Regions:
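Disulfide-bonded cysteine-rich modules in secreted/extracellular proteins
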Residues: 84-96, 180-186
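Short, hydrophobic/proline-enriched secondary-structure or compact coil segments at domain edges
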Residues: 29-31, 104, 150-153, 193-202, ...
Length: 361
């Protein structure tokens, strides 16, 4: 454990700070639920590695990372932050006689395969009950069979586990069992070397919670708002309006209607390829993202709420506005954070590398 530099050199440029490496100011973290790795933060250099870890090409986290890696130039790394899931439900998707059904369960204490062979008179109930009998003695996971479903629940909240299923079994959509503040506290305790944050959830409560958390940290949160109300200037209860009314300097949002596109991840990747202060977040082309068709009235409503758009202009699609929810330019916030960290590190290096710093002109 190393002491914090600001004990010796404390630099304040309007915003508070925590330590990030130079590389970290160009690193994106995508946050979402998954059961594919035990680590809170996993670093990937391409999407193929995500498939090897058990992600599916239809998973939101995969799609978000794919939009980031699709940009030119592409990022060297993208980090995936895991939200804790404490319970899941597994069901039989294909009932067959004399067939093997396999679940691989891993915790930090070890990995175990559970394989059940169905009888000549197989049913979903007998298969689930057979798997439950095999898994019942697990030290960290409670396994119960109910209504043709196998429920796996951690005995202690927060226990990390991964699950891999044979193709004849399926898992219901998983839900996080912790708040976003708890998620981010666990993530930064594991790996704080990132700057951009994206969230696969587009729920209003999740976006507002992460925006609030980000405002107290040296990070930048980008999100998508898909509410039609965001395009209406007379409505002030949509996510975009609420982000503006809270005056969030560290959050920017794009209006986008395609649920499988993550333009915020694409924009992060595109702009993070440029050194802090040398970029603008407007007028950027985004590979792999479908442009929205907006009327001028809708565009003006969005930008009046300090939102951003990705639209077609003749034969090219580009981003528009380039501002945070508080109305500040996104590049100004990133450069300010980078400059603050740069000054602190450089002054600290002078202090430790010189015998004495005289207090003279």
């Amino acid at each position: 454990i190393m002491a914090n530099l600001d004990r010796i050199v404390n630099v304040q440029i309007s915003l508070n700070t925590t330590g990030i490496s130079k590389e970290g100011f160009s690193t994106l973290l995508i946050v979402g639920e998954h059961l594919n790795t035990l680590s809170r933060v996993t670093t990937y250099t391409n999407v193929d590695s995500m498939l090897e870890d058990g992600f599916k090409a239809t998973d939101k986290l995969y799609l978000a990372a794919a939009d980031a890696f699709s940009q030119i130039p592409r990022p060297n790394i993208v980090k995936i932050g895991r939200r804790q899931v404490d319970e899941i439900n597994i069901s039989v998707s294909d009932v067959k006689d004399n067939t093997k059904y396999k679940i691989t369960l891993e915790t930090k204490k070890g990995k175990q395969d559970y394989e059940y062979s169905s009888s000549s008179e197989a049913s979903a109930t007998t298969i689930i009950e057979g798997l439950q009998t095999l898994m019942n003695a697990h030290e960290e996971i409670t396994v119960t069979a109910e209504s043709e479903k196998l429920k796996l629940e951690t005995k202690e909240k927060g226990t990390a586990f991964t699950v891999s299923l044979s193709s004849n079994l399926s898992c219901e959509p998983i839900l996080a069992t912790e708040t976003l503040s708890e998620t981010m506290a666990a993530i930064v305790a594991s790996d704080n070397d990132f700057y951009g944050i994206a969230l696969v959830s587009r729920e209003k409560s999740d976006i507002l919670a992460l925006a609030q958390w980000t405002e107290t940290h040296t990070k930048l949160f980008g999100c998508v708002v898909n509410e039609k109300e965001a395009t209406d200037s007379e409505i002030d209860t949509d996510i975009g309006s609420l982000l503006k009314s809270n005056n969030y300097y560290r959050t920017f949002w794009l209006y986008h209607t395609n649920d499988d596109d993550f333009p915020e991840c694409a924009l992060f990747a595109r702009c993070f390829a440029i050194n802090p202060g040398g970029e603008t977040w407007a007028n950027k082309k985004l590979a792999g993202v479908i442009a929205d068709n907006l009327t001028e009235t809708e565009y003006l409503a969005i930008t009046n709420k300090n939102g951003n758009t990705f639209e077609n202009f003749r034969n090219v699609a580009i981003t528009q506005n380039g501002k945070t929810s508080a109305g500040e330019w996104i590049d100004v916030i990133r450069f300010r954070d980078w400059l603050q960290e740069e000054i602190m590190v450089n002054v600290f290096n002078v202090l430790i590398n010189r015998d004495k710093i005289p207090f003279t002109d």
